[in-house]
């Protein structure tokens, strides 16, 4: 009997130790998971729709005060831009205090962030969307290759948008520029125009459409991102335009751009002329941009963002004549790529000026209430040739804007210009 009691004591003791070890392990796992979650969120941030905002109206003032202090302490460009942060605070603070609805707060904070005049400054407020972007030509907006969602709502290719919620397009774009984050006035105007199918607060929008001689009014529900399908394009596209001209579209600087480039580049690298297209490239990794640039330069040069990164021509670097197509959607890492290409002296730029912001070290910040924002933190600087890395779009050698006539007839104005230039028959624009 005594032996049995002793045995049970040993069993219970061992069981207790096992339970304790398991509890400690579980606690460690929970702590690790929590730490990892917080670490990941500190990098990526948390996005909120207007109806998900983790704030009550009585917290708006305190949260905005934190946002403003984060900006004052960390935003690296406001002095160069001539912004008086105290004056900016005095403009927004009473408006924030008067806000009683989440929609009011979201729009005011976004307006404040946009007032910082930086392309890489943003709030983490999600927009309702139709997963579509209009084609902007001068001050006119058109439907170009509509996605399934737009087609189901009655939109057709080449439709011209003339009004949003009854407001003429030019007026609507001007009124909404105050919410557009951009480093140049032209970029803010362009981003406002491109945002007609997105909204922080509206979930049903009316569009007046001109189709031939007909005028239509179409209603379009805007939905959460996870409720609409995005038509993704490849990172790199290559094609042979004719027996002497190759075409290479680089649509992102994010993975898998290098892998797709390695597959596509050899299919056009043997041709005497090559058109490289970054008009739809919104950026990604500047390191990838630097690697890609090495395929199009003919002598070593310093990377525009670094005093130590030397660009060396790749072993199989292109030996023919390179034309680089740029536009207002060329942004961030695509702009540092464009700047390196232009300053190489080996590449001819055609198209429209870029957005005007290579990045300036954007970082994410969070208030104690859980509201996230992103702002540039690196001091203003210039390339090794003296071009500002933020605040000025890169102007092509040949400024060639799109024309409505070419768009309506399915012609690419800028590619056609390059082809005529190669043939020696182009005229100045």
Tell what function each PLM region has:
Residues 2-273, 280-282, 424-429:
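Flexible, low-complexity junctional segments that flank or bridge functional domains
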Residues 108, 288, 295-296, 371-376:
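Long, folded non-catalytic interaction modules
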Residues 201-366:
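Cleft-lining beta-strand/loop regions that shape enzyme active-site pockets
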Residues 224-236, 384-387, 400, 404-409:
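Short, surface-exposed linear segments at secondary-structure transitions and domain or protein termini
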Residues 307, 350, 354-400:
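C-terminal regions of proteins
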Residues 341, 386, 418:
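Hydrophobic, well-ordered secondary-structure elements that form the walls
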Residues 396-429:
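Low-complexity, Gly/Ser/Thr/Pro-rich intrinsically disordered linker/tail segments
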